[in-house]
Structure formats: C-alpha cells, structure tokens
From Swiss-Prot:
Pfam families: Queuosine_synth. Transfers and isomerizes the ribose moiety from AdoMet to the 7-aminomethyl group of 7-deazaguanine (preQ1-tRNA) to give epoxyqueuosine (oQ-tRNA). This is S-adenosylmethionine:tRNA ribosyltransferase-isomerase. It comes from Aeromonas salmonicida (strain A449). One of its GO terms (molecular function) is S-adenosylmethionine:tRNA ribosyltransferase-isomerase activity. It catalyses: 7-aminomethyl-7-carbaguanosine(34) in tRNA + S-adenosyl-L-methionine = epoxyqueuosine(34) in tRNA + adenine + L-methionine + 2 H(+). Belongs to the QueA family. The gene is queA. Pathway: tRNA modification; tRNA-queuosine biosynthesis. The keyword S-adenosyl-L-methionine applies.
Length: 355
C-alpha cells in the first residue's frame, strides 16, 4: 500500500489545542471492525462497551518535562528535546540549533521559574540524536523537573502552560520516561476507573515510553519500506497471567491506546518467534503494524484520532479494516470531532480474518 492511501483532509479548526474541561467530556466514535457500523456518543459510553470479565490494558508511562531551552556557551540559542534517559546524568536528545553542536560543546540550559541554569556538555552524536551529559550533581529527572517543559506535540502549536503538567498526563501514570503522552488514556479519570472496576472489568498495566519519533512523518512512498523508531516496552508477568485468565473466562483483551497495542503485540511477536506461548517482554520494540498484520492478543481498543499518513492510522486500519477506518475518519471530520492528542476518542473492535 502507498502512504498516500492514508491521507485525509482535516480542517485546521478540528485540531484540539486544549483539552476539554473534564477528562471524560470528550466524544466517542464507536467502530465495529466487523461490519464498519458507526455509533456516535460521549466518552463515558465506553463503560457500556465493556463487559464483566474483560481486561482493560493501560500504558502507565509518565511524560517527563523533556523540552529545554538554552544556548551554547559560545552563544547561539538551542532547543533540546530528550528522547531517552541513558543514566542518572546523561540523555539522548534531539537538538534544534542554527548550527549543530560538536562533541565537547558546553551548553547552558535554563527554563526554571527562578532563572535557574544548568551546565551540560554534548558528548557524542548518534545519527540524528545527541548524547548530552549534565554537569550537575542532581539526577536527570530532578533537573528536568526543575527546568524542563512539557513536550507538547508540534501540531498543538502553542507554548506549554501549567495546566499541561496535569492534563498531558494520565491519572494512572507511574514510570517516568515518555516524551509524548499515551493519549487514549487521557480520557480516563478516577471516578470512571472506579465504575469500570465495579462492573467487573479487570485492569492491567504495561509500559511503553513513547518517543518523539511518534510524530515523525513517514518519508517513503510504500508503507512496507518504512522503518519504525525504537521505543522501550515492558509487559510484566502479571499482565501475561491476566491475559491468560481473561482468555480462560471468555473475556476480551482491550488495549487503551496504540502504545498498549504495540506493547502487547511486541510480546506476542517475540514469543511466537520462539514458538512459545505469550511471555513477559522487557525490551526495545520497533514493531510496525499495518494492514495485513495478524493480531495475536488485542480484541478491541480505545484510541484517539491520528494524523493523516501516520503509522498510527495504519495500525488502526490493520485492526478494523482499511475501508472501515477511512470511512470512520471521514465521518468524524463531517461530524466535527476534535483530533489528535487533546481530541476525541474511538472505541474500535477488531475485524476478524476470514477463514
């Protein structure tokens, strides 16, 4: 398939620049992957789509304040976006500057409300990423909390605000490391989670530290030629056990977000390669899911509306059928749903392969 097959026209005013006042106030477009049938509603309707005995799998990554501003010691402004924490004092990062810093370049980073500055050094370059070492005794996470900004996606097209520290973060986040939010999870608040559990729906948590690569455009014509960026994922034993128990009782595995889908399917892919049943997974993954992929774990998913020609709309198309998904997106535009990270959501069931 061609990347252009996944294009759709999106009016600029449908891009959500701010979240709704309440997490659960978003709209929900329900898509039956088997028939293509659509149903319009509110996000709280997700409760009606869940059955006792189902398993809801969330991504518990925490977004770090990964964007920093500063200058080279010799002058020249720069912007740093952390991609991955290497150790207590070093990161891999994207650097925007008029001239890329060379190894040994001293950096002066700031951004704290009290004018705090942090010294750092560019140690090495790894393709498009720069290895930056902080010349500060504090751990990286503490430095980022002091001077970093929330790394809002480029299409939100505004500076981060104090409210984003809470709203560009799920209520169940636990493990710091993401530089983009697992956005399907932003719609859940504690009262809704309590209702879900009260209904007899089980919950489990995987971790995938979403990287900035999630916003990179696909730069090839044929989707088969695309190489995914790599991200770290964890599927612990308790999740494997929960999936087995769900299967045994006839329940469904429902992933909240494409990152949860990719985590679970990465674990399945690794296990399948060893001809073994589903096993825990703690590794980098560059799994690329596009039409033709055979899903091993996930039966339904909650997901936001994604960018045209993105790997994420390709994943959803693989899940529910290309024609069904593109028709759903056209309907969403016509009905003026809000798109992308702070936008509305879909509840999608899987299209079963024809025997």
């Amino acid at each position: 398939m061609q990347v252009s097959d996944f294009h759709f026209d999106l009016p600029d005013e449908l891009i959500a620049r701010y979240p709704m006042a309440e997490r659960t106030a978003s709209r929900l477009l329900q898509l039956d992957g088997q028939s293509g049938a659509l149903r319009h509603g509110q996000f709280v309707d997700v409760l009606d789509q869940l059955n006792p005995g189902d398993l809801l799998v969330f991504n518990n990554t925490r977004v770090i304040p990964a964007r920093m501003f500063g200058q080279k010691a010799s002058g020249g402004k720069l912007e740093v976006l952390v991609e991955r924490i290497l150790d207590e004092h070093s990161v891999l990062a994207h650097v925007r500057a008029s001239k890329a810093p060379k190894p040994g370049t001293r950096l002066i980073l700031d951004g704290g409300p009290d004018g705090e500055k942090v010294d750092a050094e560019m140690r090495a370059r790894h393709d498009a990423l720069f290895e930056i070492h902080f010349l500060d005794p504090r751990p990286v996470l503490e430095i980022l909390e002091a001077i970093g900004h929330m790394p809002l996606p480029p299409y939100i097209d505004r500076p981060d605000e104090d409210a984003d520290k809470e709203r560009y973060q799920t209520v169940y986040n636990q493990k710091p490391g993401a530089v983009a939010a697992p956005t399907a999870g932003l719609h859940f608040d504690e009262p809704l989670l309590a209702k879900i559990r009260a209904k007899g729906v089980e919950t489990a948590f995987v971790t995938l530290h979403v990287g900035a690569g999630t916003f990179q455009p696909v730069r090839v014509d044929k989707i088969e030629d695309h190489h995914m960026h790599s991200e770290y994922a964890e599927v612990p034993q308790e999740v494997v056990d929960a999936i087995a128990a769900t299967r045994a009782r006839g329940g469904r595995v429902i992933a909240v977000g494409t990152t949860s889908v990719r985590s679970l399917e990465s674990a399945a892919k690794a296990s399948l390669a060893l001809s073994k049943p589903l096993a825990p997974f703690f590794s980098d993954t560059d799994i690329f899911i596009f039409p033709g992929y055979q899903f091993q774990v996930v039966d339904a998913m909650v997901t936001n509306f994604h960018l045209p020609e993105s790997t994420l709309i390709m994943l959803v198309s693989a899940f529910a059928g290309y024609d069904h998904v593109m028709a759903a997106y056209q309907a969403a535009v016509a009905e003026q749903y809000r798109f992308f990270s702070y936008g509305d959501a879909m509840f999608v069931t899987r299209r079963r392969a024809v025997a």
